[in-house]
Amino acid sequence: MNFLEQDQLFLENINQDNVVSAHYTSEYDNNEKEKSDDLKNKLVHKNISLNIHNIISSANLCIDINLRLVAVSIRNAEYNPSKINTLIIRLNKPQCTALIFKNGRIMLTGTRTKKDSIMGCKKIAKIIKIVTKDKVKFCNFKIENIIASANCNIPIRLEVLAHDHKEYCNYEPELFAGLVYRYKPTSNLKSVILIFVSGKIIITGCKSVNKLYTVFQDIYNVLIQYKN
């Protein structure tokens, strides 16, 4: 059986390999759900939805990887070391893109849940194991960034907000229509928020769903004070 056939067989049977990952994710999601339910409920009566668009995560396979070997052995792979010495692999299920580095580090982007992020990283680990025949160890998985958006359904007086919160804000409407709000109440909770006059916002920098909802609730409480 060649590498392509092995890869296809793995992908067809991946659900069996994801049992551990699914249980782990379920436990994590339950804990996150318990912590953030109160915040979510507060948003419901305001008719506000917070939408996650992208989760960027990372993991380590604890081996050095022959990127060229992997690139010529599987489909949906790109490797151009003259531009960047990184292998790019695209998966359809879950739909995501992985950057694989020679030192075994994986960066995954394009998923919207932690469950899919773990599944995507583990699929990449399996593919690397099949192709290289090396002993792959999947470890150090973590979420690096969550990108989300929401519509607060209120017009915002950005000029006044920028003046009152100038230590946190950067607002240059002649260059960019949005106000950049650097939220950092603690060293463990920080985010960059783009705020538009329409009330739409984009939140980046959070590393958990619970922190994302905390940031949104805090910034919403600020924004309602500047309703136009």
Curated annotation (Swiss-Prot):
Sequence repeats: 52-128, 143-223
Pfam family, one: TBP
Location of the protein in the cell: Nucleus
InterPro entries per the UniProt record, alphabetical: TBP (IPR000814), TBP_CS (IPR030491), TBP_dom_sf (IPR012295)
UniProt keyword annotation of Membrane present: no
Listed GO biological process terms: DNA-templated transcription initiation
Presence of keyword rRNA-binding: no
GO terms assigned for molecular function: DNA binding
Record's keyword terms, sorted: DNA-binding, Nucleus, Repeat, Transcription
GO cellular component, one term: nucleus
Superkingdom, taxonomy of origin: Eukaryota
Subunit and interaction comment: Belongs to the TFIID complex together with the TBP-associated factors (TAFs). Binds DNA as monomer.
Protein family (similarity comment): Belongs to the TBP family.
Role this protein plays: General transcription factor that functions at the core of the DNA-binding multiprotein factor TFIID. Binding of TFIID to the TATA box is the initial transcriptional step of the pre-initiation complex (PIC), playing a role in the activation of eukaryotic genes transcribed by RNA polymerase II.
Protein name (Swiss-Prot/TrEMBL): TATA-box-binding protein
Gene: TBP
